[in-house]
Amino acid sequence: MRAPSFPERGTVKSETKAAAKGGITTLFEMPISNPCMSNAAEFASRKKHFLENTYINFAFIPALGKLTDLNLQNLVNSGAIAFKVFTIAPPPNRKSEFDGLCFTTEEKILKALKHAKKSNLITIFHAEDQLMLDSHKQYENKYKKNDPKVHNATRPILAEASARIGRVAL
């Protein structure tokens, strides 16, 4: 949902009401918002917003944020059920939405994994190979800006498969 940011895309009320009507009873909210949910203060702010507006149960999966023991413990104590890691760079002009979420080199990804392991929680990946995405960016100009075909042209399935193999190896 990315709430409370971007209400034009949907709000906690609108999206959880729709979920409830469809029989969904629980939502796991990811960290992307503005700012990214990567520290206890932002976790608390979003939790308060959800408590005041939801129709269903919810839990949060924050970003790791700063790789300090204090930040990790504060997120765990706040109620994190898992952590989310992106293996690609944030989109241009959206860095604050991804702050503490993106780790793009094997060294940084491994460091993030070792840090997350201290929490004894699951770590979830958005796994794509940044180098492969960079090499396919050239195909972006073949399509109009909002053409859905640009996604497949610039984000080949091999970029995800390659990244997943790399994460398993780590």
Where are these predicted regions, by residue range?
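Residue-level recognition of alpha-helix initiation/capping sites
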Residues: 9-10, 41, 66, 107, ...
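Hydrophobic faces of well-ordered beta-strands that scaffold small-molecule active sites
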Residues: 1, 27-29, 58-62, 81-85, ...
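Active-site mouth loops of central-metabolism enzymes
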Residues: 1-10, 56-68, 98-102, 153-158
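Metal-associated gating/positioning segment near the N- to mid-region
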Residues: 1-53
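Short, acidic/polar
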Residues: 8-16, 66-75, 166
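Structured loop/turn residues at beta-strand edges in well-structured enzyme cores
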Residues: 22, 56, 78-81
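A generic structural signal for alpha->beta connector loops
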Residues: 24, 55-57, 120
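Histidine/acidic residue-rich metal-binding segments in metalloenzymes
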Residues: 70-85, 89-170
